[in-house]
Amino acid sequence: MVVSNCSHIGNSYLLMFRSLSRTLKPIAPFPRHIRPTPRGIYHLRMSSTSATDPTPRLSNVLAKSKSPYLLQHKDNPVAWQEWSPETIALAQKLDKPIFLSSGYSACHWCHVLAHESFEDEDTAKMMNEWFVNIKVDREERPDVDRMYMSYLQAVSGGGGWPMSIFMTPKLEPFFAGTYFPRPNFHQLLNKIHEVWEEDREKCEKMGKGVIEALKDMSDTGRTSESLSQLLASSPASKLFAQLSTMNDTRYGGFTNAGSSTRGPKFPSCSITLEPLARLASIPGGGARNAEIREDAREMGMKMLRSMWSGGIRDWVGGGMARYSVDEKWMVPHFEKMLYDQAQLVSSCLDFARLYPANHQDRLLCYDLAADILKYTLRDLKSPEGGFWSAEDADSAEYKGAKKSEGAFYIWKKTEIDEILGDDAPLFDSFFGVEPDGNVNIIHDSHGEMRGKNILHQHKTFEEVALEFGKREDQAKDIIIEACEKLRLKREERERPGLDDKILTAWNGLMVRQLCIPYMLLHKSPQLTVPQLTALSKASTLLPSSYGISSQCLPAALGIVNFVKSHMWDPSTRTLTRSYREGKGPQAQTDDYAFLIQGLLNLYEATGDESHVLFAEELQKRQDELFWDDDDGGYFASAEDAHVLVRMKDAQDGAEPSAAAVSAHNLSRFSLLLSSEFENYEARAEATFLSMGPLITQAPRAVGYAVSGLIDLEKGYREVIVIGSANDEMIKEFLKAARETYFSNQVIVHIQPEKLPKGLAEKNEVVKALINDVESGKEKEASLRVCEGGTCGLPVKDLEGAKNLLKDV
C-alpha cells in the first residue's frame, strides 16, 4: 500500500476513533494465536443507552445459504442477512447502520466470536434492534472482503478474520476491528449506537472520506514508463535484501522486521518460497549473484526442513496446517486450507529441482510433497472431481464432546502407549511425547491442549536408533507403521468440519500443482536400499511421491472436467466462483488467472492442445471483464454497484496476486500463441507496470510479481519436442526438460499421431514443424530450443539434449 494514502485513512479514522470514546483503555493481552488489530479492539465505556426488546423486523435467513460458513450461523439469534442488493436496499429503507461480519468456515476465532457474542441472546437483541447484520463468506465474496479489509489494514496496521465492520446504510465504513472478546463487543455495540444516534453526520462524513481514500489508494499509478526502467530499479535485489532481514536463521521462515516476537509463522509460498526459488536461479555471473543464489536456496530450504519436522505438519494424516503460532513451527493453528497444500507441493518441487538427483534435500522435498499430496487426494477430493476448500481448526476429541482447537490431531501419552504397545517408547522419544503434554501454556491460552501432545520431530532417526539399539532403517519403519496405526485409530474420532464448497481459483492452483509431480516423477523407479540409507541420515521418511504421482494427472483432469461441467457457461463464456449444491457467485480475476495457469501446466503435462485453447478462451474473457483500459493491469473483480471501490489485486497474501499470475500467464501465451505475441507481451508489460509502485517500494508485498520479472529478465524459452508419446527417447527428452528448474520456459510436444492443428493456427513455428512432420522432413525424435523468436538446431540424442537445456 502507498503510505501517503494509508495515512489519509488513518487520520480520518483517528478522528472517528476519538469521537467514539475519550477514555479508551487497552483490553487484556490478546490471544497469541492471532495478530491483534491495535486500534480495533478496546475496552469501551458502557453507554447509558440500553437496548429495547421489540420483535425483530428481520429474521436470520442463512439457512437458505449454500455457503458452509454462513450455514454455521444459521441458528444464531442474530438476524443475519446475506450480502445482496435486496439486503442493502432494506438497510437503506430501514435507515439503519450495517454491521458486516466477514470470515470463513475453518476460522477458529470466527467460531470463538460466534460462541461468545452471536449466540448470546442479549447481544443479538442489541444487534437486531440497532443494525442490519450481514454475514459474508470471504472466500465466496473476496471483492467485498478485500475492500473493507483494505480499510482495516490501513487504519490498524494489521488485519485478520473475523473482520468486523460498522458502516452507513450507503456502505461507507466508519469503524473496524477483528475479534472483539466478551464483554467488549457488547460494550462496543452500545458505543457505536450512541455515536450514530448523537453524531450521525460525523459518521457519514468519515465514511465518505474513507471511500475516497480507498479509491485514491487503489489508483497506484506508475513509477516507470517502461519495463526496462522497472527492471533497472533492481527489484530482485531489493526483495532479497528484505527477505534476508526477516529471515529466521535459527528456526527457518520469516518474521516481521523489528517484531518483539518471532511468531506466528505462515508458509505464505507466494511471498517466500516462490520468489526464493526464482532468486536461487537468478542469472548472471559474479560473486554477488552467486551469493544471492546460494543464500536464497538455503533460506527456502531451511524453511522447508523446519516445516517438514515441525508440528505444523500432520505427521499422522499428511498435509499442512495454515500456520504455526510459535517460532519453532511446533504449535499449529490447526485449520488446513486447500490453497496452502497446492502451493506447498509446487514450492517443494521447485526447490527439489535446485539440487542434484538423490541429494538429501531434493529427497526431503519429494517426501514433503508426497505427504501433502497423500492428504489432499484422500481427504479433500470430492467424488465428482473438484477439490473441497478446507478442514476446520476446531474439532471434538470424541463424538458429542465440545469442540476445541486441534482436538482431532493431539494425543495423550496414555493413548499412544495403548495403541503402539512395545513401539511406544521409541515413538515417544522421536516425537517428544510427554506424560503431561508437550505444549507450552503460552501457546494454549484457553488450556485446550493441556496434557496433550503435538507430534513433531524431537530427535533424529540416528539418535533414536542408537537409543533403542536399532538400525536407522528399523527405527524409521517403526515410526512409519506407528503413524499409520495412529491414523486408523484417529479415524474413530469425529473429523474436523469440512468446507465442501469447490472454489475455481483454488482448484486452479491444484491443477497446477498436480501436474508438476506427474511431470517430474511419473513412472520413476522406486528408491534403492543404499539411497534409503542415505535418506536416513537426512532424517526423512520414504518418499512415496514416486508412487503417488500416478494419481496426479487423473486428478488434474478431473478438476478441469468438473469445472467445465459445473462452473463454466459456454453460452455466456463465464465462470462461477464456487459450487456447492449449485453455482455460486460470479468468478473474479483470480478464478480466471489461477485456472488458466493450471491449464497451461496441464497442456505441458499431456501435450493435449485442448487445454491451451480453453486457457486462451478464458484469457480473452478475463481481459473483457477485468482489464483496466486506462492504467493497464487487472481489476480484482467485475463492476458491481454495491462494491464501492473496484480494487486491483496487486499484493500477495496467502495466495499469489491475481495480477502477478496473470502477467506470468500472458508471458507464456506470448510464446505458445506467438501469432499474437505483441498483444500478449504488451499486456504482460502493462500488468507489471501497473504494480510498479509496489515493486519498487515494497517488493516483498509483491514477491510473485518480482518472480515474474526475474523470469522476464532471464528471457522466456520454448522447448519443442517432436515425436510419439510412446517413444522412449521422447520420454527422456521430456524428462530432461522438466527436471531442470526453469520457471521461464514452456514445453511444446508435437506428436505425429495427434498433431496440434489448432495450436498451429496460432503459432507459426509449430505450423512449420507440423508441415515438416507431414512431409517426412521430421522423422526422428528431436528436441530444439527457441528464444527471442529464433529456434536452434534440433538435437536427437539425450546427451545433446541435456547439454542444450543446460547451456541455454
Residue positions per predicted region:
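The core hydrophobic/aromatic register in alpha-helical repeat solenoids, strongest
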Residues: 276, 348-351, 514-517, 599-602, ...
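Intrinsically disordered, low-complexity cationic segments
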Residues: 7-10, 32, 42, 610
